[in-house]
């Protein structure tokens, strides 16, 4: 319960990051873009069809920059003060923590274990926490790993709290060598913890290699004769915090769940798993707040729960209307820092409007909001209005919305009315939890319209806009060090596939009932709508692909793409200012020029591969030809994570030894790499043809072709941006472009070079 005294310092503050200099730069770039468009309109009749194509592409780029400028206009974030929490709040609220996983091969159990261990050891009362792991793969190996982790955490959590360990994921903590003296108490405890963690890793790895011995354990009987897409509901209470004495009271609840899946029933991928987590946790612990993280996103800040509670427990109307608190998505092995820069500027910009967009991980939700409440359903003190009480609390409405489980309906009523749940034995609730996991439980209910929303493989964007449409706000906290850290897919096929899924899900939002294009009377601010349009920027992939080919086409056909004479300064100034601006954004955050270049290159590649094929996926779905599937991204764990002694000792830097070599790019024979290879070959052919003509002194300067210097520079810039493909022409193995991809791209290049508008 929070203290209402106004004399106490606030739990959190809204920090504004407005910068008039950045506004001027953004507006200047926008003016230059519009000037270029106006110049093309004035001279459209004097030039060929190429100018019309360029005009359409540049119109798309200008529209996107207009949206970006609007979003970044008033950046803000919330700054929490968790050290003030104990003074202001006498009884901290409970928090349920969700960790979904789906495939023990692509998401190794040891990764899940480290994430769970980091959550179970956070600085928060253990009796107020519960961790639920949803296993959509129904893997006995995942359950076994959690059982072993529950034994290890009984010594790990007290160790972390005793020595105030910051990084509480063991695989990261033990990367750094011991610096204490050998005879110190800490040194002895550290070595003991390292040995125990190595034992844990070995047990998990041994079970991974040969899991047949698990069949002899009666506790694994529920996993017999199961398949990932065909099995009954399994709910296992791995560890229950019953108070107790000593170290046992330091460990929160840990529950393993796997919902029923049958081949002929829709299960809605991760979204369905999140709704099952919502129902099971409501039955068992019914915490008013919930944290969800991806299975590889460990808690890097032990006070992260307390930081989020500072927002929710602040005595203000805004805190009552805050639906979720979003932390940035950061990575310890990132091949690009573009996401860090993006979140620093764009996420803060959105946070200054109605609040950040939910990004699927590192987010604290309010249970009442996920149960379907709108902001208008609450009084100023946070209680339900009389109208909302009649709508939500009638018996018919409860069954129609939430299903036939009496236990779940009772827990929903308690959650909506903010009633505290009496302590219950989790073991006694397993049967009720299994009932709400049946594959037919959601039929003829509102699940999918409340909770995590269906109709998109990007459940985060879809759910986020549904929340903001109901009038709720959200909060953005970006602490230093980052609250959560995760792993990125390898540079190449895995990253491309993941971005394709993200892009496909984002475009799906345009065509469902949560679309920002419709419902202008809903309770969402206009600039917040623009923020969701920015998320859908992947639709610019076609203009991006075309624009990468235009300079080469003009060189090959002796035609002009860019203005001539003094007006060429518009293009030069625009490109130069944009490059310097984005470079400054990287360097001001401490990143290198090389990091900026790699990020620019990678995002051009993603735009012409992942985003391009996501449009194809949407078209095929709309035509009813195919459905969009959910592809689990492979989580890679470096050898240094296993806990075994490493020959090379990393330094004290948190990320030492884990960064991928910049510029290394992996290829496979999938169609994703044909566009990039095609772009590279076309621009190389255009440059080669131009040099040959220049050498023969037969290149014509008339006919509207100009000196072709601008087009040549454009081709050279595109070659630089697609440099990984140039390297791939000469590499072998996974770093080389497969012959099948190269031959298809070469065939397209020949067709392109011989075509004339």
Curated annotation (Swiss-Prot):
GO biological process per UniProt: cell wall organization; cellulose biosynthetic process; plant-type primary cell wall biogenesis
Topological relation to the membrane, as annotated: Multi-pass membrane protein
Active site: 136, 460
One GO MF term attached to the UniProt entry: cellulose synthase (UDP-forming) activity
Xref: InterPro entries: Cellulose_synth (IPR005150), Nucleotide-diphossugar_trans (IPR029044)
Pfam families associated with the record: Cellulose_synt
EC number(s) reported in the record: 2.4.1.-
Spans traversing the lipid bilayer: 24-44, 50-70, 530-550, 568-588, 612-632, 672-692, 706-726, 735-755
UniProt keyword annotations, A-Z: Cell wall biogenesis/degradation, Glycosyltransferase, Golgi apparatus, Membrane, Transferase, Transmembrane, Transmembrane helix
Tissue specificity as recorded in UniProt: Expressed in young seedlings, primarily in the root vascular tissue.
Subcellular location per the Swiss-Prot or TrEMBL entry: Golgi apparatus membrane
Domain of life per record: Eukaryota
GO CC annotation: Golgi membrane; plasma membrane
PANTHER family in UniProt: X-BOX TRANSCRIPTION FACTOR-RELATED (PTHR13301)
Family: Belongs to the glycosyltransferase 2 family. Plant cellulose synthase-like B subfamily.
Function per UniProt: Thought to be a Golgi-localized beta-glycan synthase that polymerize the backbones of noncellulosic polysaccharides (hemicelluloses) of plant cell wall.
Name this protein carries in UniProt: Cellulose synthase-like protein B6
Phylogenetic lineage: Eukaryota, Viridiplantae, Streptophyta, Embryophyta, Tracheophyta
């Amino acid at each position: 319960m929070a203290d209402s005294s106004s004399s106490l310092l606030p739990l959190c503050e809204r920090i504004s990051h407005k910068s008039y200099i950045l506004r001027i730069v953004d507006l200047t770039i926008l003016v230059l873009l519009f000037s270029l468009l106006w110049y093309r309109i004035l001279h459209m009749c004097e030039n060929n069809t190429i100018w019309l194509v360029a005009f359409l592409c540049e119109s798309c780029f200008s529209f996107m920059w207009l949206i970006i400028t609007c979003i970044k206009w008033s950046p803000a974030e919330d700054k929490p003060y968790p050290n003030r929490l104990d003074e202001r709040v006498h009884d901290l609220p409970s928090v349920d923590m969700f960790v979904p996983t789906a495939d023990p091969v692509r998401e190794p159990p040891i990764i899940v274990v480290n994430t769970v261990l980091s959550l179970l050891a956070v600085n928060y009362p253990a009796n107020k926490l519960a961790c639920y792991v949803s296993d959509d793969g129904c893997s006995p190996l995942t359950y076994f790993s959690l059982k072993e982790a529950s034994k290890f955490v009984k010594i790990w959590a007290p160790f972390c709290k005793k020595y105030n360990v910051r990084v509480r994921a063991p695989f990261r903590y033990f990367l750094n060598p011991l610096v204490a003296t050998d005879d110190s108490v800490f040194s002895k405890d550290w070595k003991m913890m390292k040995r125990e963690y190595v034992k844990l890793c070995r047990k998990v790895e041994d079970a991974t290699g040969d899991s047949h011995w698990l069949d002899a354990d009666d506790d694994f009987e529920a996993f017999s004769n199961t398949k990932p897409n065909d099995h009954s509901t399994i709910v296992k209470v791995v560890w229950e915090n019953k108070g107790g004495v000593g170290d046992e009271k330091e460990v929160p609840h840990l529950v393993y769940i796997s919902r029923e899946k049958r081949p002929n029933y829709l299960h809605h991928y991760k979204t369905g798993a999140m709704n099952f987590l919502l129902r099971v946790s409501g039955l068992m612990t019914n915490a008013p707040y919930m944290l969800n993280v991806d299975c590889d996103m460990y808690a890097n800040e032990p006070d992260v729960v307390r930081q989020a509670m500072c927002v929710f427990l602040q005595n203000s109307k805004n805190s009552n209307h805050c639906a979720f608190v979003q932390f940035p998505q950061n990575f310890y092995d990132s091949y690009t820092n573009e996401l860090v820069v993006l979140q620093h500027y764009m996420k803060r910009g959105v946070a200054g409007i109605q609040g950040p967009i939910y990004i699927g991980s590192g987010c604290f939700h309010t249970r009442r909001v996920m149960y379907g409440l709108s902001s208008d359903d609450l009084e100023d003190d946070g209680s339900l209005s009389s109208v909302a009480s009649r709508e939500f609390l009638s018996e018919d409405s409860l069954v129609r919305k939430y299903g036939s489980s009496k236990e779940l309906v009772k827990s929903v009523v308690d959650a909506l009315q903010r009633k505290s749940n009496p302590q219950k034995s989790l073991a006694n609730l397993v049967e009720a939890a299994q009932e709400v996991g049946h594959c037919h439980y959601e039929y003829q209910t509102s699940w999918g319209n409340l909770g995590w929303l269906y109709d998109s493989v990007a459940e985060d964007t879809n759910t986020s806009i549904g929340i903001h449409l109901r009038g709720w706000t959200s909060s953005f906290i970006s602490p230093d060090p980052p609250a959560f850290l995760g792993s990125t897919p390898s540079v190449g096929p895995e990253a491309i596939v993941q971005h394709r899924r993200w892009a496909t899900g984002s475009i799906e939002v345009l065509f469902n009932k949560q679309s920002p294009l419709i419902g202008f009377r809903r309770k969402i601010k206009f600039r917040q709508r623009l923020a969701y349009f920015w998320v859908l920027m992947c639709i610019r992939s076609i203009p991006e692909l075309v624009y990468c080919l235009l300079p080469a086409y003009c060189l090959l056909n002796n035609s002009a793409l860019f203005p001539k004479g003094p007006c060429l300064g518009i293009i030069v100034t625009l490109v130069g200012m944009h490059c310097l601006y984005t470079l400054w954004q990287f360097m001001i955050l401490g990143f290198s020029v090389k990091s900026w270049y790699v990020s620019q290159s990678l995002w051009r590649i993603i735009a012409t591969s992942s985003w391009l094929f996501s449009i194809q996926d949407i078209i095929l779905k709309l035509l009813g030809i195919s459905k969009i599937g959910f592809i689990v991204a492979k989580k890679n764990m470096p050898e240094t994570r296993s806990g075994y002694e490493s020959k090379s000792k990393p330094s004290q830097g948190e990320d030492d030894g884990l960064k991928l070599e910049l510029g290394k790019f992996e290829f496979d024979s999938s169609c994703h790499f044909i566009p990039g290879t095609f772009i590279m070959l076309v621009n190389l052919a255009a440059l080669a043809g131009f040099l040959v003509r220049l050498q023969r002194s037969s290149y014509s300067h008339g006919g509207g072709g100009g000196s072709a210097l601008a087009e040549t520079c454009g081709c050279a810039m595109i070659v630089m941006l697609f440099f990984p493909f140039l390297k791939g022409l000469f590499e072998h193995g996974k770093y080389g472009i497969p012959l099948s991809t190269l031959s298809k791209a070469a065939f397209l290049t020949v067709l392109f070079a011989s075509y004339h508008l």
